[in-house]
C-alpha cells in the first residue's frame, strides 16, 4: 500500500476520541478520514474539531465505505464481536480495543472470520509498545537476568469507573488485570497454565450489585515453570500507578515509575515530586506507537505483535480468574488450544 492508511475511528468516548487525536497528530503512516458514533451530534462535533470531512452516527455504515482501508473499533465491548466480523467481511483492516469480546465463543468466531478473510486484527494491549516494557522485553530475551521465574505486576487506578461502565465491563479481572496477563505472557515468553483469583470490595460498596470488586489479586503459573501475581486496584487517589517486576535466576528488572517529571522538591516539609495523574499521561507514547505499528503492518502486510489470538488467550485467562474468584478454587488452563494452532 503506497498511500497513507485511510482510517475511521468508531466509538468516540474518552479512549476513542484520544485515538482519533493521535491519528491526526502522531501517526504519519495513517490518515483519519472518518469518525463514527451513535450518540447524536458526537461524531459531527469531533469531525469538525479535528478537521475530518466524513462522520456518521451509524458505525456499521462506515464499515461498508470503500474509501476506508482500516477501522479503529472503540465501541462498547458488547459490540466488538459483531463489528469485527462485519469489518472483516468488508475487507477492512482492524484495530480493536481490549478486551476483544466478553465471551470466548464470540472471540473465537471473530478470530475465525479474521483468519478466513485474511485481514489484519491488532488489539489494544498498548503496554507491549511502551518503551520501558519494550526495553525490559529486549533485556529479558538477551538473557540479562537469566531465566525469568516470577512476574509481579500491579495496576492501580485513581478510582472506580462509573457504575454504567462496571455493569458492562466484564469485571476487574477482564477489564483491568487482563493488561498484566498479556504483558506477563509477552515478557516471559510463556503461557499461563493456572490461575487463582481473589478479591474484595474495600472502598466502593456499589460494586456489589454488579458482582465486581475494587481490589483483586491473581496468582498465576506458567508452562515454563515460572509463577507470578497480579494486583488490580480501583483505589489509588495519589495517581495512576502501574509497575512490574520480573525476577530471573540472575537478576531482576523493575518497570515503571510514579514520577511524572524528573523533578524533586526539597523543603522544610520534606521531599516531594509530582505523580503520574492518569493512564493517558503514563502511556501516551505507547498509544501513539501502537497505532504507528498498526499502520506499518497494514502498509506492509505484516502481522502485528499482538493479535486477536493473543486477545482471546488473555480473555480466557481473565474468565478463568473470574471463575476462580467466584468459586474459591484454582482454574487450570490448557495451553494446547485448538484456536491458536499451538
UniProtKB/Swiss-Prot annotation:
It catalyses: scyllo-inositol + NAD(+) = scyllo-inosose + NADH + H(+). Keywords: NAD, Oxidoreductase. Its EC number is 1.1.1.370. GO terms for molecular function: NAD+ binding; NADH binding; oxidoreductase activity, acting on the CH-OH group of donors, NAD or NADP as acceptor. It holds the Pfam family GFO_IDH_MocA_C. Transmembrane segments: none annotated. Induction: Induced by either myo-inositol (MI) or SI; SI is approximately three times more efficient than MI. Disruption phenotype: Inactivation of this gene abolishes growth on SI as the sole carbon source, but does not affect growth on MI or glucose. It comes from the Bacteria. GO terms for biological process: cellular response to inositol; inositol catabolic process. Gene3D superfamilies: Dihydrodipicolinate Reductase, domain 2, NAD(P)-binding Rossmann-like Domain. Pathway: Polyol metabolism. Catalyzes the reversible NAD(+)-dependent oxidation of scyllo-inositol (SI) to 2,4,6/3,5-pentahydroxycyclohexanone (scyllo-inosose or SIS). Is required for SI catabolism that allows B.subtilis to utilize SI as the sole carbon source for growth. Cannot use NADP(+) instead of NAD(+). Belongs to the Gfo/Idh/MocA family. This is scyllo-inositol 2-dehydrogenase (NAD(+)).
Amino acid at each position: 500500500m503506497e498511500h497513507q492508511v485511510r482510517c475511521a475511528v468508531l466509538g468516540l468516548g474518552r479512549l476513542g476520541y484520544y485515538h482519533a487525536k493521535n491519528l491526526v497528530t502522531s501517526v504519519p503512516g495513517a490518515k483519519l478520514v472518518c469518525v463514527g458514533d451513535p450518540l447524536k451530534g458526537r461524531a459531527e462535533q469531533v469531525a469538525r474539531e479535528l478537521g475530518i470531512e466524513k462522520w456518521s452516527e451509524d458505525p456499521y455504515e462506515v464499515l461498508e465505505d470503500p474509501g476506508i482501508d482500516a477501522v479503529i473499533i472503540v465501541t462498547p465491548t458488547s459490540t466488538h464481536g459483531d463489528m469485527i466480523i462485519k469489518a472483516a467481511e468488508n475487507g477492512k483492516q482492524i484495530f480493536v480495543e481490549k478486551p476483544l469480546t466478553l465471551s470466548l465463543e464470540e472471540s473465537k468466531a471473530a478470530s475465525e472470520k479474521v483468519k478466513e478473510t485474511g485481514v489484519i486484527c491488532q488489539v489494544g494491549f498498548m503496554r507491549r509498545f511502551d518503551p520501558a516494557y519494550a526495553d525490559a522485553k529486549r533485556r529479558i530475551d538477551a538473557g540479562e537476568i537469566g531465566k525469568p521465574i516470577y512476574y509481579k505486576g500491579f495496576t492501580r487506578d485513581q478510582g472506580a469507573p462509573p457504575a454504567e461502565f462496571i455493569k458492562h465491563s466484564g469485571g476487574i479481572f477482564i477489564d483491568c488485570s487482563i493488561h498484566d496477563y498479556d504483558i506477563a505472557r509477552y515478557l516471559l515468553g510463556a503461557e499461563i497454565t493456572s490461575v487463582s483469583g481473589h478479591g474484595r470490595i474495600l472502598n466502593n460498596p456499589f460494586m456489589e450489585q454488579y458482582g465486581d470488586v475494587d481490589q483483586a489479586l491473581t496468582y498465576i503459573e506458567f508452562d515454563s515453570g515460572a509463577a507470578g501475581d497480579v494486583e488490580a486496584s480501583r483505589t489509588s487517589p495519589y495517581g495512576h500507578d502501574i509497575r512490574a517486576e520480573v525476577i530471573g535466576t540472575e537478576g531482576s528488572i523493575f518497570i515503571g515509575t510514579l514520577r511524572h517529571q524528573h523533578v524533586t522538591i526539597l523543603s522544610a516539609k520534606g521531599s516531594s515530586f509530582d505523580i503520574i495523574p492518569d493512564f493517558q499521561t503514563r502511556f501516551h507514547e505507547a498509544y501513539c506507537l501502537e497505532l504507528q505499528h498498526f499502520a506499518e503492518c497494514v502498509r506492509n502486510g505484516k502481522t502485528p505483535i499482538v493479535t486477536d489470538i493473543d486477545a482471546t488467550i488473555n480473555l480466557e485467562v481473565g474468565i478463568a480468574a473470574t471463575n476462580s474468584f467466584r468459586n474459591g478454587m484454582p482454574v487450570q488452563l490448557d495451553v494446547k488450544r485448538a484456536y491458536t494452532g499451538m
